[in-house]
Amino acid sequence: FLRLVDQARQQKFAVAVYESCQVTDLQITNAGVMIATNQDLPSETFDLAVIATGHVWPDEEEATRTYFPSPWSGLMEAKVDACNVGIMGTSLSGLDAAMAVAIQHGSFIEDDKQHVIFHRDNASEKLNITLMSRTGILPEADFYCPIPYEPLHIVTDQALNAEIQKGEEGLLDRVFRLIVEEIKFADPDWSQRIALESLNVDSFAQAWFAERKQRDPFDWAEKNLQEVERNKRENHTVPWRYVILRLHEAVQEIVPHLNEHDHKRFSKGLARVFIDNYAAIPSESIRRLLALREAGIIHILALGEDYEMEINESRTVLKTED
């Protein structure tokens, strides 16, 4: 970070860094964005304010002795007995929560070939962890790709701006047609395999997740990990993964211009694909997850779209359609 700041200043950018500076309020005015802090700083109005808050820390009062609304609401410091532990979410945050519980009841051991095993403590035989999400799908491992990103050939700034200028009606569908052409250009074989030409904004996400939904999530994670590690060794980029990663940053520019109907369609479809792609997680997290599976400790439950969560004093109960 400091190196980047230094490089920016060398190129005549004015960069100010305020450490331990808490933003207490934001006010949007006709002149710009006014920011209030807990430090005695000169009042300043900004043309653009980027809010990068990171994790949202829930109200500590929501946490109980048996319920933690996030890994950062006391779970990391709590003593969790060897019991039936349910974790909402299969993203990296959910896996972090699982690891925080697991290391209280054993240890991870890695051999020379990067294979990880989990050694459970003798007194922790009753430990059982269930990861729960609507789909039960696990994130994939970080994949190899060139950085800085290579430019897109079809979904360019000029092409997107031209579509935006045509108006919000049909904007999402027009841009999706550009996306299809970009993906076909990058990876014609994969495009043919998923029948890309037959898909639309609403069905693309279904095709993206279809094969993973049919497979055991742990088996898929193991296969994906092997592929990712092989690609890293060989400096091989998977074209369709890489083009989706680059498309995400480009396509997000149209989101403020979508009408309400298309905004909902985008959130249900393309947004989920983009999130799944860029939210890939470190290989080490996958290895530890698989180690817990091999130890018979961790399981995954797909909740479906309709479920209820009842938080009681002694336990939390989830009710699903089944």
Question: How would you describe each model-predicted region?
Answer:
Residues 1-322:
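Flavin (primarily FAD) cofactor-binding/catalytic cores of flavoenzymes
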